[in-house]
């Protein structure tokens, strides 16, 4: 999987998973599966376009995380990107822009907490206020 933490005006984007899907109702950073012909970066650019209608270029690679859920395992390539405009933003699911301090108000999949820890380890505190 490839996931991107998207920042806009010091806030980050969370999208709520559909209730009828696995981990339904939880909030997460946008992203998705990597197709067999794609690089991790190409996948995250495609997924962000599909999920948000935002066209991002040159997302910064942060690293990989692994997480074992009860019935499946994920390996996630994490990227981050600051955007200057959200005029083209179109999201079908519920979404919100929040500060990292506001994240505790939302139920996130466990893997998302590992992503936040990875961002902190990579000196991204300027985004994690």
Question: For each of these PLM feature ranges, what is it?
Answer:
Residues 29-63:
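The catalytic Nudix box helix
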Residues 78-82, 87-122:
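NUDIX/MutT-family hydrolases
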Residues 123-129:
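Helical scaffold of the NTase/Pol beta-like nucleotidyltransferase catalytic core
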Residues 1-2, 39, 93:
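Short loop/turn microsegments at loop-to-beta-strand junctions
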Residues 28, 73, 96-97:
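Short aromatic/basic micro-patch
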Residues 13, 35, 104:
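Nucleotide phosphate-binding site architecture
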Residues 1-28, 83:
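N-terminal strand-loop-strand
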Residues 2, 49-86:
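Active-site segment of metal-dependent pyrophosphate-handling enzymes
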